[in-house]
């Protein structure tokens, strides 16, 4: 970082320029073109060079090497697919499970039409959208936690 020149408020000429709104042109260092054309690209290229250098000099494994002859007991998807996986795992009819998954975006598309006359931005003045959001969040968290548990405890989360 460089040191910028501050205005001298004891100087009457500087005070007159600042009073007219002209002071910003006469002190300091402008951001254009110095910072944006010269300093920022060097910082960005230096960061990329450091990351590339570390990747070449110290490569790290992404995960355990795959063993095609040993499969895990239970295959789990990535964490962001847990609620969908739980729906498919607990619903006995697979077509019903797929329809339940498709109903989530369809239900979210109907929320703006339920409150189309309500123009408030405050969530407390839009009760339908707030309720749908809160219930959807609780259900998604419930399903996500349940997907990580065994099937017999997945719906109750082992609490009941």
Curated annotation (Swiss-Prot):
Where found?
Plastid, Chloroplast thylakoid membrane
Q: Where are the transmembrane segments?
A: 36-56, 95-115, 131-151
Q: Which GO terms describe its molecular function?
A: electron transporter, transferring electrons within cytochrome b6/f complex of photosystem II activity; electron transporter, transferring electrons within the cyclic electron transport pathway of photosynthesis activity; ubiquinol-cytochrome-c reductase activity
Repeat as UniProt keyword:
no
Q: Which InterPro entries match?
A: Cyt_b/b6_C, Cyt_b/b6_C_sf, Cyt_b6/f_cplx_suIV, Cytochrome_b_C_euk/bac
What is known about what this protein does? Component of the cytochrome b6-f complex, which mediates electron transfer between photosystem II (PSII) and photosystem I (PSI), cyclic electron flow around PSI, and state transitions.
Q: What is this protein called?
A: Cytochrome b6-f complex subunit 4
Source organism of this protein record: Psilotum nudum
Q: What is the lineage of its organism?
A: Eukaryota, Viridiplantae, Streptophyta, Embryophyta, Tracheophyta
């Amino acid at each position: 970082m460089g040191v910028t020149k501050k205005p001298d408020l004891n100087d009457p000429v500087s005070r007159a320029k600042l009073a007219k709104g002209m002071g910003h042109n006469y002190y300091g260092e402008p951001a254009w073109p110095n910072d944006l054309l010269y300093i920022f690209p060097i910082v960005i290229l230096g960061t990329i060079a450091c990351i590339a250098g570390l990747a070449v000099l110290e490569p790290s494994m992404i995960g355990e090497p795959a063993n095609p002859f040993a499969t895990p007991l239970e295959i789990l998807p990535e964490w962001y697919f847990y609620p969908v996986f739980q729906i498919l795992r607990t619903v006995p009819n697979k077509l019903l499970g797929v329809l339940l998954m498709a109903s989530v975006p369809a239900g979210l598309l109907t929320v703006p039409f339920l409150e189309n006359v309500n123009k408030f931005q405050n969530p407390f003045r839009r009760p339908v959208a707030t309720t749908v959001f809160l219930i959807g969040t609780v259900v998604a968290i419930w399903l996500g936690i349940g997907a990580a548990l065994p099937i017999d405890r997945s719906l109750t989360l082992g609490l009941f």
